[in-house]
């Protein structure tokens, strides 16, 4: 009898120490919007004895409005032809910016 009471009191003591109040906010934090890496594209090729041409382009979003409708991006590129009967061409550089507006759906 005394052993049963001792075990019951021990269980009550353990249960009271483990009983924590639940936190007020049990919801998960919202997932942040994805951060896309720099968008790079490239290519090249040529015929035998014709040299080799290649080009690289890139685009990066630099600003987006809070509502997501306005967006500004920067883009640039580089291209050149190497070798062939006329030798190397001058490098071709491209730099620009883009503005995008997304119309709301009515």
From Swiss-Prot:
The keyword Secreted applies. Keywords: Antibiotic, Antimicrobial, Immunity, Innate immunity, Secreted, Signal. Its main location: secreted. The keyword Secreted applies. One of its GO terms (cellular component) is extracellular region. Changing residue 55 to G: In strain: B306, Z18 and Z22. Residues 20-23 form a propeptide. Belongs to the attacin/sarcotoxin-2 family. Antimicrobial peptide required to resist Gram-negative bacterial infections, regulated by Dredd. This is Diptericin A. The gene is DptA.
